[in-house]
């Protein structure tokens, strides 16, 4: 056992799950894409208010999903995924504002956000069904 009460087999299992989870993979890809979008907009358009909000919410999605994998209970797991979903929805809003205001024109990042949101909704529904 390590200092956190998790044995080696549990750590290995969690590492495997985390490295192969489509939700974690997609949310990390999205976070990296958000960082690039925000850097581009800051450099080319000198806009910081929207991008600061977007970078916070867009990178927090994956962080909350990762936290969920180490939740202390099923209810905690569901709560963390729900926070990630709210952050995803917020990111979608900031992206819509950036795109519709003309600060950014590549809608593929918005498509990625919607993809992550759908995965989160599906994961939440499954987790809630398994918790009943």
Task: Label every model-predicted segment.
Residues 1-67, 71-132:
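Short, C-terminally biased terminal segments at protein or domain edges
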